[in-house]
Amino acid sequence: MSKSHTYVLGINAYDHDVAACLLRDGAIAFAIAKERINRHKHSTGFYHDVIDYCLRAEGITLDDVDLVVRNCYVLPVGELERRLTYQDVPEILPPKERKLAPEYPLFRSRSGKVVDISHHVAHAYSAFAVCPFKEGALMVVDGVGSYAADIAEEGHRIDNLSPLARESESYYRFEGSTLEPLKKVWLEPVTGFLADEFFNMNGLGALYSRVSSYIFSDWNKCGEVMGLAPYGRANQFKSLVAFANGSLDVPEWTEAFDQPYLPEDEKWESSPGMQHWQDLAWRVQDDTERVLIERAIWLRETTGAKNLCIAGGVGLNCVANGRIVREAGFDNVWIQPAAGDDGIAIGCAYYGHLAIHNKPRSFVMEHAFLGAPYSDRDVEAAAKKWFVTVKTCHAPDDDITAETARVLAEEKVVGWFQGGSEFGPRALGNRSILADPRKAAMKDLLNARVKHRQAFRPFAPIVLAERAAEVFEGDEDSPFMLLAKRVRPEWKERIPAIVHVDGTARVQTVRREHNERLYRLLLEFEKLTGVPVLLNTSFNIRGEPIVETPADAMKCFLSTGIDYLAMHDLLVGKSRYHRLFYPVMKWGSDVATMIKVGTGTDLSRGEA
């Protein structure tokens, strides 16, 4: 390919959720997280595979890239790579990657076209640079960002601040391509030690991760905490934060919290500590919502902005997001779908495009389908497996959407694999497991046969955008499944499989122009059932990332109780012989999953 385009590459490097994003002339060409390639959730380490994925998809080499912008919240990438040459840091770079890294052109690069930026700046650019607003306010809230010593943002330095202080919250105003910092909240180190665990620090996102670690023995289970919170009793614990006049303090973890989950517990959900955990989840969720709403109101009053953008890992809390939309007073709210650290790659790329190349904003992120597409030949090759039946459907007479809608209406579970994969943690209709939401039993069936998740966790709906206000309260668009909405009373009994215990649902609205095939599937299902809603959950098995390739999809399909797999125009079923071999395949899948998640034989603590 001739060099007729300008390319900028953004990278989230080394720590959790390694990812890359490639811009072509200011528009996102491709983006991918490392976990989708190596099949290990929240993957850390070297970044060559995500870069190679994007370059291969575009048909270019690294020499064609004009600028590379990177971030690692642990240390600036350049400094970290210098240390890796003489320090033993196995959790950062395992032996295989340590051998590979020095051979890669970007490792320890001294090229002028390689730039490092700080963490919250990258989060900020990931949101405002691709939002639909010309101007507005922006909030970044996460567990932890860069060290004060590594930040060069104007207006964000404070005298006498420890160089080991970390970013916790950052607030900005933006207009066009210009980003203006307004306020930053810092985490002061507890011990002054460089490796102090962030979730022991004095911050909002850090506190939420601390509760996640306490309840689930994993700091990265914040979504599970959010799902557990509605089961808790209100105000059984006093507030975990002290928040007044815009000042936030998180008191030390108290001795009252003495019932942490231990991985050797055989039955988590029947544990005597369950009510305690539910009450604590309610408490931290309520505290988080209260602080975020007050911060958002302050930001609106300070800036006079009508539009708000949100990024950072706390931005994945769809319950808090829903309250911000309803209560903070902004006309419009846009949330980066990859609000966590995978989205750092998008922010790095756009920092390069806007701040270094000085280009104007021109791209709006209307969808998150940023993975490379797979060919029909790839799909057909993957489908040539034992114990399956394959039907080829072609529009308009034998459309895959009509055939899939038919089996869904018969209460079958369908794996749905179309187009490029979603970037970010949500399955938004290209790598999804779909089901009929009209019976509450569907939730239990999915958990028993496919997902093996905790029973308290809800499943989400996808809905035709023009019908959403009829089914759910509020008229806000929610294309990225980042808003919790109340299900209208007259619909609760019609779609019980997607209604959470508090009467809400994490809604995704679907428009024809963003996903034609998924939209048509919803139309076909509505024709058959009168319901413009489907249950949507991520296409993966417990402990694994969402499927990326046709081969990944076939593996998940064959080793679970999914009834059909719709890949492109193929509808793949299971032959009668599969029923004979399925118990053995399921046993092998369960064993592999238990090894991967490290929870012994307990199948009650699955991941989405």
What are these regions (language model features)?
Residues 61-73, 304-313, 415:
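Short glycine-rich phosphate-binding loop at a beta-alpha junction
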Residues 57-103, 107-108, 116-117, 125-127:
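Short beta-strand-loop/turn "lid" adjacent to the catalytic site in phosphate-handling enzymes
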Residues 52-66, 296-304:
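Phosphate/pyrophosphate-binding loops at sites that engage ATP/ADP/AMP, CoA/4′-phosphopantetheine
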Residues 7-8, 15-33, 38-41, 91, ...:
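Flexible beta->alpha loop and helix N-cap segments adjacent to enzyme active/binding sites
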Residues 114-117, 270, 274-290, 511, ...:
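Short acidic-aromatic active-site loops that bind/stabilize oxyanions
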Residues 283-308:
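Phosphate/ATP-binding catalytic cores across multiple sugar-kinase/actin-like superfamilies
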Residues 244-275:
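A mobile "lid/hinge" subdomain adjacent to the ATP/sugar-phosphate binding pocket shared
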Residues 36-61:
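N-terminal phosphate-binding loop and adjacent alpha-helix
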